[in-house]
């Protein structure tokens, strides 16, 4: 029961993002599997958990056309798979399913991945050194690649489980300082956060952006207060500053409100 398209365009799901293309890319016999074990793989299986699926029609939407992708995975040699070709055929199958009275996902109007997530972006802080404040380290299980994750130019997708979103649950949540290596003209600093209330992932209640030339004394550029409201939607919000400043160090702090939980952000973009 993972979202198969942009969460705000879909009924509430358990979480995650599993589009048709990702199902089609699944390899049930990975290269790491030894030859004597390959013969033990007899087929594939997909499960649909229905805690958030109230009707048969909803279940059909979650199954079709993703089950068609899994079927082709099962009977096709990976070397002959072609997603573009499959996608064209899947569009026709969706129409055929509708004609038979089923309720498949509207593949023709698929929104696709989160904007910016398909290719790296460039900005002033990409590749710069990042340090984390005391009691504000990222959670090891959601490191997104480690200390460089927030300045690697990689934008997160629709789910915090895609290994692109860095998670914070330490006492002071998020306190990140970027060393620009030299005094740099800065016109904007911003970061996106996501909220998914079910697994206790919330927006920050306060964000502070500040700068420094010595890395010790910081001047506050902007302080943002945000009232965190629980709802059933997956939401994304940018907290940023725009203006004119010149500094070597940029500090980005974000704290949690009354609900606690995780903070997740994917990139601190500096322009």
Question: Where do the language-model regions lie?
Answer:
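A short, polar/charged loop/turn motif at coil->beta-strand junctions and beta-hairpin connectors
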Residues: 38-40, 124-126, 144, 154, ...
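Short proline/glycine- and polar residue-rich coil/turn motifs
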Residues: 227-233
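Mature N-terminal, pre-catalytic/accessory segment of carbohydrate-active enzymes
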Residues: 103-156, 194-195, 235, 261, ...
């Amino acid at each position: 029961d993972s979202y198969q398209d942009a969460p705000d365009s879909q009924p509430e799901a358990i979480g995650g993002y599993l589009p048709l293309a990702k199902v089609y890319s699944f390899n049930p016999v990975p290269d790491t599997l030894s030859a004597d074990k390959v013969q033990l793989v007899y087929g594939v299986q997909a499960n649909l958990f229905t805690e958030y699926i109230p009707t048969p029609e909803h279940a059909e939407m979650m199954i079709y056309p993703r089950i068609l992708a899994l079927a082709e995975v099962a009977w096709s040699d990976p070397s002959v798979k072609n997603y573009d070709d499959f996608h064209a055929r899947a569009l026709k199958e969706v129409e055929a399913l509708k004609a038979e009275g089923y309720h498949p996902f509207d593949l023709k109007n698929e929104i696709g991945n989160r904007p910016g997530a398909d290719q790296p972006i460039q900005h002033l802080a990409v590749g710069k050194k990042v340090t984390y404040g005391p009691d504000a380290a990222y959670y090891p299980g959601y490191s997104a690649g480690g200390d460089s994750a927030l300045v690697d130019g990689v934008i997160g997708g629709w789910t915090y489980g895609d290994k692109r979103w860095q998670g914070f649950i330490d006492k002071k949540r998020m306190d990140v300082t970027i060393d620009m290596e030299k005094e740099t003209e800065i016109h904007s600093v911003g970061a996106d956060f996501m909220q998914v209330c079910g697994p206790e992932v919330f927006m920050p209640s306060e964000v502070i952006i500040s700068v420094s030339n010595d890395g010790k004394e910081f001047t506050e550029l902007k302080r943002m207060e945000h009232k965190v409201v629980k709802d059933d939607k997956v939401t994304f919000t940018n907290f940023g500053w725009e203006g004119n400043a010149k500094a070597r160090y940029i500090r980005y702090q974000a704290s949690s409100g009354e609900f606690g939980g995780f903070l997740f952000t994917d990139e601190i973009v500096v322009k």
